[in-house]
Every structure is written in structure tokens, then in C-alpha cells.
Amino acid sequence: MSVARTGKVVQVVGPVVDVRFEGELPNILNALHMVRNGERLVLEVATHMGEGTVRAIAMDSTDGVVRGMEVTDTGDTIRVPVGRQTLGRILNVVGEPQDEKGPVETTETLPIHRPAPAFAQQATSAEILETGIKVIDLLAPYAKGGKVGLFGGAGVGKTVLIMELINNVAQEHGGYSVFAGVGERTREGNDLYHEMAESGVIDPNSWENSKAALIYGQMNEPPGARARVALTGLTVAEYFRDLGGQDVLFFVDNIFRFTQAGAEVSALLGRIPSAVGYQPTLGTDMGALQERITTTKTGSITSVQAVYVPADDLTDPAPATTFSHLDATTVLNRAISEMGIYPAVDPLDSTSRVLDPKVVGEEHYHTAREVQRILQTYKSLQDIIAILGMDELSEEDKLVVNRARKIQRFLSQPFHVAEVFTGTKGVYVPVKKTVQGFKELCEGKYDNVPEAAFYMVSDIDAALAKAEKLKAAS
């Protein structure tokens, strides 16, 4: 560490602060500290302007910052507290606690800008992470140590799905999770914290009993914080993987806001924008984050990233850049949510590289493909049904349509985290039961069971029990 250098603020434009240093300049990405209204403010060096001046991005509001204020170069990048003591806590982009429970009791810190693991350290494995959510486990299973994208427009259920995954993994697998809230609603962050406390995922009074750490940089934060908070969360997750030998779950809600914040910072720094106004370094920024999320010989990070799709356009540069890094995609479709089927996962658009007979087994693979074939046939028949009606279909097509409608309803299930809203108890469905239920459904074993019996149930036994109830009620 070099001797602390001090400089003076010469210009403040919103979150951008220009600082003049006498002599040697701080390195790009170095953290600068200053005191504003009695509180520490962290800046990150972005550009060397020449004539002894650097341009830095503030990680918090610059209210109260005036010309002539003293700024100190830390000689290092932003460092954040890591370790088990971060579990059950809410931290901000620079690792300061936001939950009014005092400082994080750890002496260990790591820099948020770190190189990705070398090839020699990486490990490849093809193992499924069971989520207990039927549509995901059957049609687009998640790989342990893989990257998953949740794609969807506004209000189709990305955050609810993430909350259910955190809940299921904590309850069934007992692993640690790190949640990075990047530029999303403060209310949702608050709800998530209280729901985690209620479900036992975190204990607000004890890190020993907590299974998740929360790192927040919400919508109201300046762009510098939103552009870096995903890296802070990833650094906390990397500690558990590299030094704790853990299989960690890393949730990002929302990776689009990371790109959006990068575009804002880029514009503030005066860089020429590329397509649709995004930063020219879009691919580089995304790669720097995604390449660090990987499986090593000591542990793994399985990442689930919600991806907001602007105007439901999957060809927008932000979601399109994210696509290339993913092992599985879970696409949420507004048309499915409008039918009242939740989770609103599109069974034909969602993909996974581990849906392979070598990984999931022949029975699972063939059942999944048969389910997709039936749904695809139904989709291609919908125009005929809309114009001519069901009566014009052949007997074989009528059978396919009836099975497809049952499959659509059977792909829905009640969530634990939505119990408060729905009044229906949430369910966790093991993969074996999911595959068995859909296999028998495709074979025509339940052609005489009404389709209403398959809506919002766990497995095939629950569907048959519901059918008996419906029969008795009529």
C-alpha cells in the first residue's frame, strides 16, 4: 500500500466528482474517501483527465460536497467485509450495514474488482440442482455451478420466482445464498428481508443461524452504486466458494439494472454511446462480472439472474448480451400469466444445456421432449381452433389438445412465498414425482380426469385427490 495521497475537489456534477492531486495520481478503480456532513463518502476513480485531475464516480449522494473539500486516496480498490458474519445482514455497495444492527463483526475484507479464476482452477461438472419447481426441473433444469437467466417483462413474476428459489434451496439443500439487489424497488428489498426472517432463512439476531447475505443498491441510489453492487455481492459469494469450500447460490435482481447503471455512468463520463444508447463497453462490463461466476475445484457459485426485458424485446442489446453467458434460460411469458398459470414460465422458450439424457437420464429427457411436442402441436393448432372451433379437429388432434391443456395447468404450482397472497400452501415437488406425473399424463393415463384437477397442485396424487373433490362437489 502506498502512502495516502490527498487531493481537493474541483468540480461536482451530480454523482461525478473531479479531484485534483499534486504529484502522482491514484490508479483507475482506486477508492477515494472523503467526509461529507460528518459521514464517509466513497468515490471510485474512473478517468484520468490530465493536469493532475481525476474524474471519480460517487457511491452515494453528493449532497453537501463542495469545491475545495479534501479527498484521500486509499491506494486500493473498494474493499468489502466478507465471511460468515455477513450472513443475515443487509450491506450496501461499500459493505456498510444498512439494517441498524451495528458493524459487521469481521476483520476480513476483499476487493470488489478481482480477476476471474484461472483455467487451471476451474472445474466442469454436469449435475442438476433440484429446485422443487415442476416446470423448471422438468423442462429447463438448472446445473450446479451454472448460470441461469430469468427473462421477463415488468410484473410477470421474476422476483417471486427468485424468492421461492432462495426459500427452497435454503430449506432443502441447506446452502448459503447471497442476494444482490441491483436497482430494484426498495419495498421489494424490505419485503424480501422480512419474508426471509419469517421463513427462517435468516435470523436477524444471529449470523450463525442465517443462510443468506443481502447486498442492496436500490433504484434510488446513484448510478455508481448500482453499477458496482453486483460486484460487491459476487465478492461475498466468492469468499464462501474459495475459502469456505461451499456451493453458493448467488441471486441478482436485476442484471438489466447493472447494464442500465453502466450506461448512466458511461454517459456521465462523456463516452460515446453504442446501439440503443448503451455504453460502448457493454460486452466487457458483462463479461467481467459473468466470468467470475464459475465452479472451481474448491466450490461452486450457481447464479440465478433476473433479466428485465425492455418492452418484452429479447433482441435488445442488454438481454441479448446476457444470453451468451447463460447455461439455462427461464423465460416468463405474459400470455401465460394472463391465463392465471403461475409460475408463468414458457415451457417452449425456456432452455437448458443440462436437459441431456447423459445428465438427467433417458426417462426424464424423453418425458420433457414429449411434453414440449404436445404443447408445440397445441400451439400450432390454436389458429384453427380460433377460426373453426374444436369440432373441426381430427380425433387425434382433439386428444393432443386435451392433454396439452392438462399439461399447461399441471405446470402451475402454489409457492411458499406467495402463501400470504393466495391462501394456498406452497409445495416442493421432487424431480422423480414430477417426471412420473408428466410421463403418465403424456401416455394418456389421465385422459378422463377433468383439466381443472391439474391446476395449482403438487404431484399427480394431489391432482387425483382434487378430481375426487370436484366430482363430489358436482
UniProtKB/Swiss-Prot annotation:
Signal peptide: none annotated. GO terms for cellular component: plasma membrane; proton-transporting ATP synthase complex. It comes from the Bacteria. It is a peripheral membrane protein. GO terms for molecular function: ATP binding; ATP hydrolysis activity; proton-transporting ATP synthase activity, rotational mechanism. InterPro entries: AAA+_ATPase (IPR003593), ATP-synt_VA_C (IPR055190), ATP_synth_F1_bsu (IPR005722), ATPase_a/bsu_AS (IPR020003), ATPase_alpha/beta_chains (IPR050053), ATPase_F1/V1/A1_a/bsu_N (IPR004100), ATPase_F1/V1/A1_a/bsu_N_sf (IPR036121), ATPase_F1/V1/A1_a/bsu_nucl-bd (IPR000194). Its main location: membrane. It catalyses: ATP + H2O + 4 H(+)(in) = ADP + phosphate + 5 H(+)(out). SMART domains: AAA. Coiled coil: none annotated. It is found in: Cell inner membrane. Pfam families: ATP-synt_ab, ATP-synt_ab_N, ATP-synt_VA_C. Its EC number is 7.1.2.2. Keywords: ATP synthesis, ATP-binding, Cell inner membrane, Cell membrane, CF(1), Hydrogen ion transport, Ion transport, Membrane, Nucleotide-binding, Translocase, Transport. Produces ATP from ADP in the presence of a proton gradient across the membrane. The catalytic sites are hosted primarily by the beta subunits. Belongs to the ATPase alpha/beta chains family. F-type ATPases have 2 components, CF(1) - the catalytic core - and CF(0) - the membrane proton channel. CF(1) has five subunits: alpha(3), beta(3), gamma(1), delta(1), epsilon(1). CF(0) has three main subunits: a(1), b(2) and c(9-12). The alpha and beta chains form an alternating ring which encloses part of the gamma chain. CF(1) is attached to CF(0) by a central stalk formed by the gamma and epsilon chains, while a peripheral stalk is formed by the delta and b chains. HAMAP family: ATP_synth_beta_bact (MF_01347). This is ATP synthase subunit beta. It comes from Magnetococcus marinus (strain ATCC BAA-1437 / JCM 17883 / MC-1).
